[in-house]
Swiss-Prot record:
InterPro entries membership: Mntp/YtaF (IPR003810), Put_MntP (IPR022929)
Name of the molecule in the record: Putative manganese efflux pump MntP
Domain of life according to the entry: Bacteria
UniProt organism field: Clostridium perfringens (strain 13 / Type A)
Gene: mntP
Keywords associated with the record: Cell membrane, Ion transport, Manganese, Membrane, Transmembrane, Transmembrane helix, Transport
Transmembrane segments: 3-23, 36-56, 67-87, 130-150, 152-172, 187-207
GO MF annotations in UniProt: manganese ion transmembrane transporter activity
Biological function: Probably functions as a manganese efflux pump.
Amino acid sequence: MSILSIVLTGFGLAMDAFAVSVAKGITLTRVKAKDALKVALFFGGFQALMPLIGWGAGRYFADYIKAFDHWIAFILLSFIGGKMIFEALKEDDEEKAEVAVSMEVSKNKEREFANMKRKEELSAKNLTVLAIATSIDALAVGVSFAFLGISIVQTIIIIGIITFVLCFLGVIIGEKLGDIFKNYAEIVGGVILILIGINILLEHTGIIEKLFS
């Protein structure tokens, strides 16, 4: 698995966390740099930790499934990517309108209870739950890493940094631009993961080598 593939996988995995970070930016008024930093640290940290856990589990079973490990990686990445796309597209126009209204209502309430809302949104408990929820996919992808012969330390550092940067920017973007980009981010992330899965399958079955030989 090349560095480029790892970077693209990092972007794909980070899109759920990015979308949630945008939502955080929407619900917070007058976002400060330390607010964005806190969100980014939680999401980036868990996004790096989960693949490591998955990799450890995958290594335990690697010898038993080595003959078809590339199919496992392909299926996991394609399933996760497809799930992200499906979840982003399943909301109809009526639901989106309701979300837009609820966001506007929450902003009005937020002006009255800004301090209380900020503490709730940025609490360690709240961020931990969200960080775990958005990094479950990374746990599954981490299992596939065990079969690819990659440097797990280098990989989780790359994934963690990408998630950190995107989530930091996501909070700021959320405050400025609202929830326009949330679903698009998840769709892009899903497509990236599916393409990475296809690439792994083609590489390990020798199809790419035959095409370019």
